[in-house]
Amino acid sequence: MASNGYSNSADAVPPPPSDNDGRPPSPPPPPPDSFVPPPPPSSLAPPPPPSSDLPPPPPSELLPPPPEPKKKKGWGAPKPGPLSIEDILKKKKEADEAAAKPKFLSKAAREKLALEKRAKEVEEQKRKREAEQDNRISIGSVNGNGNGYGSAANGRDGYERSYQQENGRRESSFVPTGPRAMRNSQQSRSSSDKPNDMEPPPKPAKSAAAGTGKASVAGEKRPANAEDLQAALIKTRYMGAETNQSTFSAKKKRRRTTEKKFNFEWNAEEDTSPDYNPIYQNRAEAGLYGRGRLGGFAEDEGATLKYAKALEERDAEAGGARAREIVEMERRRKEDAGRNSLDKHWSEKKLEHMRERDWRIFKEDFNISTKGGAIPNPMRNWSESKLPKRLLDVIHQVGYDEPSAVQRAAIPIALQARDLIGVAVTGSGKTAAFLLPLLVYISELPPLNEFTKNDGPYAIILAPTRELAQQIEVEAKKFATPLGFTCVSIVGGHSLEEQSYNLRNGAEIIIATPGRLVDCIERRVLVLGQCCYIIMDEADRMIDLGFEESVNKILDALPVSNEKPDTDDAEDAQAMSRHLGGKDRYRQTMMYTATMPPAVEKIAKKYLRRPAIVTIGNIGEAVETVEQRVEFVAGEDKRKKRLNEILASGEFAPPIIVFVNIKRNCDAVARDIKHMGFTSVTLHGSKTQEQREAALASVRSGATNVLVATDLAGRGIDVPDVSLVVNFNMATNIESYTHRIGRTGRAGKSGVAITFLGNEDSDTMYDLKQMLTKSSISRVPEELRKHEAAQQKSQRGQGMKKIEEGGFGGKGGGGGW
């Protein structure tokens, strides 16, 4: 209380130094009940005592006066009077209205409030530390004086001496910040050691220490200039941060503590030099000769035009010519900037402005990878494809607005007369990718007449199944018929007489299965004397079905006079596009497949010359638009019940395809589906060609809801808008499974594939789990993830493959496998 009283009086008016010289130290303060304030300074007259005769002042005089730098205290302070009820209610109403109004704080105000709050926290922490330090000093003084067992006088004298020594050290460690008139009094009062002095107060240096602490905190938090900031940063760098000072920086990028990678890169946000050095805050701009920021060439066109206009006004003849040169230079600069700009997407650039980086991004966007020499860049749209105008018109009439990924990459390569191997997933648009270059190729050959029509077709397309061959025929007629070309399909199931009648007028393009085409060649129904374009679609499937020998016979029957050389000339587009001896051109061979088994590689190495390899996506992976679901359902009855639940849910619209493994089961499942109330047809190898075509036609037209088929329909069959594929029995290998689920999700549309698994499917569980893991929209069920057969790849079947390949060449002893 005494220290507070003296500090208040000292804050109001400092006492004159002449009155304090030579006086003994002030006596200790009296108790609170007998407290008498010190007499007022002589320079100010005390206010008159309040008279009881005068009436109380009106409420307007009781309002607080404007803020003054210092308030009178003690006897000079005005005596507060009672407030009226109206004033209290008025103040309360004004306070409520002020509190209800939203108060906007600027950034500087928010920073000021944060600094004040931080200063108060630091002051409170420092006050606590000083209190603890004083407490330790007092305890140490008592213990050092005989553990407190000495006399009271000795204990008090020892306490006073220890306090004076500690106080002297503390005052000497701080720089005086108070008024000059009060320094001597404090020093004399602290340095006096007379026997008649009483004990000092418990915290005599609190005000000085607190004042010094506030000043230091304010100096640390808000330095006066940039030099103090830089000095503080250097001090922190070499001496370390203070104990209670946060080292968090909002600008510095934070890294996770669990991250093990070492970061070798430097981020611009980690530069803290602009915080303390103002030279880094303002970027220096180049000032060159001439008007404008860059010597007459400003970044905006308006400044350039203004400069050119000023030149023209100054000198109409020479200045006008110079102005036109400046405008032309600015235009060229903008064109160069647009050509070399990295911020534009490849779709916004012109073809001549595309750089190597843009083509890499383009290929990554469409998941295109190419291999081979002298491969041209892909096409971004149909207008850049270099196709003839009449063919482009047909493409737009058919409704092909944007090319697919395989069409973007394969068509420019095929137009250069290069041999090609295309590896793409099912439903990716491969048919148009090889049909369009084929039509361009044969359009440069002379049309067939009465003499040349007997020499055979210009091109043949091989397909593994009848359905796929007929599907390619339908697609080819869309483009070939408007151009005046004839397409004929030769497949099994139809009589040779009927197909011979279709070939009576000749045909430029023949689509055939390998077995039936070999029969036609051996029976002299067809010759390949002028065939110079060969396409093998689903080549891996043809090998799986045992057509390898038939394919070799067909390729050996081709003429050798126009075969490409196995040299670097095979990669030269101009050399391969030349005509040989008038009408003949070099033979061009293309192969499309979903996988690349060794037998397919062997055929490609024998008959293709320096082929370019185009891969869309990853080999053997499913289409990304198909959601794969796997359910463990054991037993035929439970699977039929689950199939009924799926069909009756109404989640999937027809058509729906259900795959089984054996023909007998195919008819049984179709019969059960009819009992469920849905129309169904079957498709398997025992059906005649007419029955197959009728079944596919009913599904495509919408007359039938469900198609139940074996793996015969798993390759190349295009039924539009299939929403669901159900694998009633899991396929025997992962390749067949991939082609099964590829019947849905075609042409960029989404689809769902549901597979019923059992313990009998352990050979394919590992590959199935890997395929589900790679899919971004599919989920691996826990039962499959933890299954023993899914932990490692099955070794079953490799021994059987060795038996087939050894000794009998796949016949005789190995045929039973």
From Swiss-Prot:
Compositional bias of kind Basic and acidic residues: 118-135, 780-790
GO biological process terms on file: mRNA processing; RNA splicing
Domain of life per record: Eukaryota
Subunit structure: Component of the U5 snRNP complex.
InterPro entries documented for this protein: DEAD/DEAH_box_helicase_dom (IPR011545), Helicase_ATP-bd (IPR014001), Helicase_C-like (IPR001650), P-loop_NTPase (IPR027417), RNA-helicase_DEAD-box_CS (IPR000629), RNA_helicase_DEAD_Q_motif (IPR014014)
Gene3D superfamilies in the cross-refs: P-loop containing nucleotide triphosphate hydrolases
Annotated segments matching region Disordered: 1-86, 118-225, 778-817
Coiled coil (UniProt feature): none
Record EC number: 3.6.4.13
Compositionally biased spans, kind Gly residues: 806-817
SMART domains hit by this protein: DEXDc, HELICc
Keywords: ATP-binding, Cytoplasm, Helicase, Hydrolase, mRNA processing, mRNA splicing, Nucleotide-binding, Nucleus
Short sequence motif named Q motif, residue ranges: 380-408
EC category: hydrolase
Low complexity: bias regions: 205-218
Name of the protein described by the UniProt record: Pre-mRNA-splicing ATP-dependent RNA helicase prp28
Residues annotated for ATP binding in this entry: 424-431
Short motif DEAD box, span: 537-540
Organism for this UniProt entry: Botryotinia fuckeliana (strain B05.10)
Intracellular or extracellular location(s): Cytoplasm; Nucleus
Domain annotation Helicase ATP-binding: ranges: 411-614
Reaction(s) the record says it catalyses: ATP + H2O = ADP + phosphate + H(+)
Keyword Cell cycle: no
Record note on domains: The Q motif is unique to and characteristic of the DEAD box family of RNA helicases and controls ATP binding and hydrolysis.
Composition bias, Pro residues: 13-67
Nucleus found in the keyword field: yes
Organism lineage: Eukaryota, Fungi, Dikarya, Ascomycota, Pezizomycotina
GO cellular component, one term: nucleus
